[in-house]
Amino acid sequence: MTANARPNLIFIVADDLGFADLGCYGGREAAFGPVSPVLDGLAANGLKLTQGYSNSPVCSPTRFAMITGRWQYRLRGAADEPINSKSRGSSTLGLPPEHPTLPSLLKASGYRTALIGKWHLGYPPHFSPLKSGYDEFFGPMSGGVDYFSHCSSTGQHDLYVGEEEQQSEGYLTDLLSQRACEWVKRRNSDGSDQPFFLSLHYTAPHWPWETRDDAAIVDDVRANLFHLHGGNIHTYRRMI
């Protein structure tokens, strides 16, 4: 592939999103209007897939498959669900750094790579996005964090830049979007013709059930991050 034939790539992933809940796949409007107008617009002006199959539609196994292109259970870490904060320090529950990945192969081909969003493929010091092909990382290492405090289900703060914890205020979905926009703008203004690959992996609409208007319930959710009793279709739709 020639240098001028290498397009910039942005791979956007939602978490625990039912495909039929999007307007472009027949989802009904909410009381506040269309649930997914931006995604609907992308679908209307792009390519929409209508058939698919997932042999393990849960957090970490899905990500093992996406990043390696293999059946996830060929890798030891993908046999455990979930990989959570209790897995910190494990040298087996994660994506082996030596294994080829989509970002590592693109990086070897001259791409600048970044993951902004959820990783959930093992914890430092044995595993991290920076060890599996990404040049830069901003997001949580675990499967789900509070959207405001950015704490995991064990109460540990879980928001990183690279492999260092980062304190940032704001609703996580918005923080990820802002970081992604800033990253793309930097790539466009740095004077380099190096192509880029950006993985933008949102945690939304994964639990805990919090919209942008729910900052007041953070302390209640902290004691029960799964917060399953707080989920309803109205909150879910606003998180999309």
Task: List each model region and its residues.
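Formylglycine-dependent sulfatase
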Residues: 1-240
